[in-house]
Amino acid sequence: MGSTALGGGAPARLGLAPKDGVFGSNLKQCGGFMLKTTPKVGSSSVRVRASVASSPQKQHSPKTSGVKSGEEVRIAVLGASGYTGAEIVRLLANHPQFRIKVMTADRKAGEQFGSVFPHLITQDLPNLVAVKDADFSNVDAVFCCLPHGTTQEIIKGLPQELKIVDLSADFRLRDINEYAEWYGHSHRAPELQQEAVYGLTEVLRNEIRNARLVANPGCYPTSIQLPLVPLIKAKLIKVSNIIIDAKSGVSGAGRGAKEANLYTEIAEGIHAYGIKGHRHVPEIEQGLSEAAESKVTISFTPNLICMKRGMQSTMFVEMAPGVTANDLYQHLKSTYEGEEFVKLLNGSSVPHTRHVVGSNYCFMNVFEDRIPGRAIIISVIDNLVKGASGQAVQNLNLMMGLPENTGLQYQPLFP
């Protein structure tokens, strides 16, 4: 992987150092229950415990950074029964060093993972357990794939030495008042909110490398910030009139049973949603504002399209005086030269979601608008990979001192 950052990147979410839990290192309070962190003596396997009562136990030595080639990194996946959790498991199946030791899914506790996701039945995995029964004593790092609003207390209760990548929205916004406004409840871990580093890998890789807690970006923000952040930092486009039309596959809405996501409701159609204010808007505006060093607002309309996975973002921008669409193209080309997972297409090639499905790639291109002074930028990603689980693995690779592409060299599926 290349190491080019976008003009040095936006300010990272670096702040308060991790604090010791009030219950010490063996037992951690977590929203009304206790997380067990005692090891099983003489065994490397995961032990699931229903009781939190125990005598003091010897602590394991976590691998926090600089992992050697071939050295095992022990992984916990929280919320493994959702789409992003399952995608983490799929990606790690071919990872040479990450080994899953703990998998949680409260509603599927006690079940085998292969019975929940039969396409992964060949994998040797631990049974699913409830979060409250999970034993983190044999774990070095955590992928948290739980819904927003549920992760704050859980992450507060995890052992302080663990590396954590959170795929929810709980730690993405720097302003806790803005979080409360958009998500409808106050933030319950403001000290972690200050500590967390935003995980847009190609922009903030140096900060991610040294982080303990990374807030993995949302899918729409990833597809939009990757092309726009470098252009805004270079002052090649105006920030006063950015219009974005984005389309996502249905998996972006999650695996929960919802009437709006039934086949008969979405088949052979496309519809806009979140028109007045999608929750990814403040995340996008936060990243663009940091790039501009001034407040940026956008017009953003997401659409749900009848396909399983994939995302396309079409961005309509006004160029700075004297700037051409080719200038935008050349700047993006030089910015992402050497980057493995961000590719600028040649000539008039139009990015297609089908060409990135199953991969960690972001394909993009720039087109001249028929209106003088304006340009159209199109980017595509797989919303479950580069827009979620793939970027999460990319980030943890960085945090553990591994090459970013480790376990992610999947080519897109076609047809």
From Swiss-Prot:
Q: State the pathway, as annotated in the record.
A: Amino-acid biosynthesis; L-arginine biosynthesis; N(2)-acetyl-L-ornithine from L-glutamate: step 3/4
- Any single GO CC term annotated in Swiss-Prot or TrEMBL for this entry: chloroplast
Q: Which InterPro entries match?
A: AGPR_AS, AGPR_type-1, NAD(P)-bd_dom_sf, NAGSA_dehydrogenase, Semialdehyde_DH_NAD-bd
- Which SMART domains does this chain map to? Semialdhyde_dh
GO MF annotation list: N-acetyl-gamma-glutamyl-phosphate reductase activity; NAD binding; NADP+ binding
List membrane-spanning regions: none
Extract the Gene3D superfamilies matched here.
Answer: Dihydrodipicolinate Reductase, domain 2, NAD(P)-binding Rossmann-like Domain
Q: What is its EC class? A: oxidoreductase
Write down the CDD domains for this protein, in alphabetical order.
AGPR_1_C, AGPR_1_N
UniProt family annotation: Belongs to the NAGSA dehydrogenase family. Type 1 subfamily.
Query: What is the protein's quaternary organization?
Result: Homotetramer.
This one is known as Probable N-acetyl-gamma-glutamyl-phosphate reductase, chloroplastic
